[in-house]
């Protein structure tokens, strides 16, 4: 397994070499194709994923077929959190919104590794905490902030998860992510392009001015980013000298 993939995924990069080597034989490269379905709601979870690049979205679909994003996952995280919490059923559908790659693993094998490795288990619990905080922040954001602010936040979050500032994105999909009509997305993206913050062409977005996007985004972007750093920063996981346990250090 290429070391680049391990270093690129934030959670895998926090593991010691010894812990990672135990996982490595069970990990395999997976291509995240655009709109690929990773999980269907209320169906068993067979595999879990550590994204390397690309972005997956958790989507809730209502009885009339409408869908809205409730969470996003990229190279900072992990697709398959219910497995970490003792469940094997997906509570929502998960789709690839920005194509890329990931490292996949059988869900049963991963659950076994969690039970035998306290460091991996605690890393995943911290990630679950950070992710649920992000979901809560997004819910507040959807009620309190303007569409343009939310769109800028979403573009920034996606940019942070990609190797470059250029990625695939359609108005239709962004509309589902933000829970607004496609015409609204067209107006907002057009305004951002006119202001020189982005370039949008044939389903591709290029971020031209990251700083200006941050200024237009709501505070939710920075709040979520800092919370991930607090819970999953480079100093969050420190091996102890005793052979029996490797624990996550306290975070002030």
Annotate the PLM regions:
Residues 97-99, 114-181:
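Polybasic "coupling" helices that flank or enter modular domains
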